[in-house]
Amino acid sequence: MTVQRHSKHFEPEITAFYCIYCGYMAADTAGALNVQYPANVKFLRLPCTGKTDIRYLLEAFEQGADGVYLVACPIGNCHHVRGNERGRARVDRARRILDEIGLGGERLEIFFMSGSQAHSFAEAAHTMTARIRELGPNPLKKIAPLPAEGRDMPVPGDDEDVSFRGRRPDPTQRTE
């Protein structure tokens, strides 16, 4: 996959998974020390990075993430003995899949750090933001999502009512 420069105004959407031990403590320490990191990163907790499923990583891209990373305990210091090593193996496998489908394995990363490494936690977010900004938006974002519940959405020009023009109606609002 070739790297293309994109607008500086492109703000990537990044999903970060972190374990409840070192990853969470690093995030908490960063907050306590007021260490700044990009606001474009959405964090999701895992019991352990060893519980990371390749499907979760790939689904994050399907849901529109431009980049994904994991924050794991340091190698040899996992609270679940080898969970971080299992997480690394799953990231490696998911990278190969991303390369095979043409999305690019460089959009996925794993960082190892202890709970006291607040600056490393922030640096991981900065590193991924810069990398994804260089790579550009997730090409899957250009593909329209499937309609809810498998229903066909009306196409402008059909005889059907197209008043919502691709927007899904709010099911909580009553229509008379």
Task: Annotate each PLM feature.
Residues 1-176:
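Iron-sulfur-associated redox domains of electron-transfer enzymes in respiratory
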